[in-house]
Amino acid sequence: MRHQCRVPQLGRPADQRKAMLRALTTQLIREGRVTTTKARAKALRDEAERMITLAKDGSLASRRRAMGYIYDKQLVHALFDKAPNRYSDRKGGYTRITRTVPRRGDNAEMAIIELV
């Protein structure tokens, strides 16, 4: 039984779920905003905020952890250059989730997640 298991399953096996969240995190950092389902946006928020917190730390160990998660190495370097200046006054809450219209095919709740 899954009593009080806080990990969102997202209807996928663990390996597919991790790969999807890595891809969404990479896209969010690259583009600045992503349109996805509300459940995926909420799961993505945790991962994106963790990567930005690592970038604010700026240590070599943090950079290596981010490189192991984000698919694009050049994007990691850009994130570590920009994040400390952009988010220096924030202690968290680097993303914003805005609900949009439901998806046409299956009426799934959609949301836009963007970097603040």
UniProtKB/Swiss-Prot annotation:
It comes from the Bacteria. It holds the Pfam family Ribosomal_L17. One of its GO terms (molecular function) is structural constituent of ribosome. One of its GO terms (biological process) is translation. The keyword Ribosomal protein applies. Keywords: Ribonucleoprotein, Ribosomal protein. One of its GO terms (cellular component) is cytosolic large ribosomal subunit. Belongs to the bacterial ribosomal protein bL17 family. Part of the 50S ribosomal subunit. Contacts protein L32. HAMAP family: Ribosomal_bL17. This is Large ribosomal subunit protein bL17.
